[in-house]
Amino acid sequence: MSRHIPKKRFGQNFLQDAFIIHSIVAAVDARPGDVVVEIGPGLGALTRPLLRALPQLHVVEIDRDIIARLAAEFPPERLVIHEGDALAFDFGALAHEQPLKLVGNLPYNISTPLLFHLATYADRVTDMHFMLQKEVVDRMVADPGCADYGRLTVMLQYRFAMERLIDVPPESFDPPPKVDSAVVRMIPHAELPWPADDEENLSALVAQAFAQRRKTLRNNLRGWLDDDDFAALGIDPQRRPETLTLREFVLLSNRHGEKGRQ
C-alpha cells in the first residue's frame, strides 16, 4: 500500500518516536478485560502495541484512507473501527458494561473542543491518556494566578485529577508540528472536590468570567452577581478571574443559582 500523505484538514501528525510510543503504552497499562478506545489511531503507532496487550481495541477515526489501511492490517474482531468525528462520537455507547480507558494522539486543530466533549463522559471512564499541544497541557494543569489558567483549566480540574507525564519534541512526529507537545493523564475524581449545584450554570459562569481576562469579576459578572453577593462569599469583586480557585468559582455559581431560585 502506498505511503499515506498526512491531511492538514484532519490535523494529522503521526507519532513515530519509539521511546514516546513505549512511554504512552506503559502509562496506559492496558490489561485483558479493559475496554480501551483509541481516538485518531493514524498509522497505528499506538494501535499495534496496544493490541499486543489486548484481545480487542476500539478506535475512532474520521479519515477513510486510514480506515482502509487499518482494516487491511487488523481483523475486525480484534480492531473495532468506528468511522466518524470524535467531536460528535457517543463514547458512552461503548461503556454500557464497564468504564472505558481512552487514549490518543488528539488532532491539535480540535483539541480544546474535543476535551470539553470528552469531559462529559467523566463518569464512564477510568482514565484518559492524551498527546496534545504542550500549551494546552500547560493550561490543563495550571494553578490559579498564572497566565495559562483559564476556562479550560477550571472545567477540566472540576472533573479530573491531571498530571503531565512527558514532553514531546516536534521531531517525534511525521510531519513535525510547529509546536511542542506533551502527554497528559486525566483521572476522573471519585468524588468531586467541590460539587456545583448546577454544572451547566458553573460552565456558563466560568465562560462569562473569562470572557475578558483583563477585566475584574465585577465587570465580567455584571448582571450575574452584585457586590452583596461577592461580600457574602468573601470574594473581592476587584479580582481578576485567573486568581480564583475552583472552589471559589463553584461558590459563585451556587450563589447565582440560589438567586435564580428565589
Swiss-Prot record:
Q: Name one Pfam family in it.
A: RrnaAD
By its UniProt entry, which Gene3D superfamilies does this protein fall under? Ribosomal RNA adenine dimethylase-like, domain 2, Vaccinia Virus protein VP39
The yes or no answer to whether the keyword Acetylation is present is no
Catalysed reactions listed for this entry:
adenosine(1518)/adenosine(1519) in 16S rRNA + 4 S-adenosyl-L-methionine = N(6)-dimethyladenosine(1518)/N(6)-dimethyladenosine(1519) in 16S rRNA + 4 S-adenosyl-L-homocysteine + 4 H(+)
Keyword Transferase tagged: yes
Keywords, comma-separated and alphabetical:
Cytoplasm, Methyltransferase, RNA-binding, rRNA processing, S-adenosyl-L-methionine, Transferase
Q: What class of enzyme is it?
A: transferase
Q: Which SMART domains match?
A: rADc
Q: Could you tell me where this protein is found in the cell?
A: Cytoplasm
Coiled coil ranges (UniProt) are: none
Protein family: Belongs to the class I-like SAM-binding methyltransferase superfamily. rRNA adenine N(6)-methyltransferase family. RsmA subfamily.
Q: What is this protein called?
A: Ribosomal RNA small subunit methyltransferase A
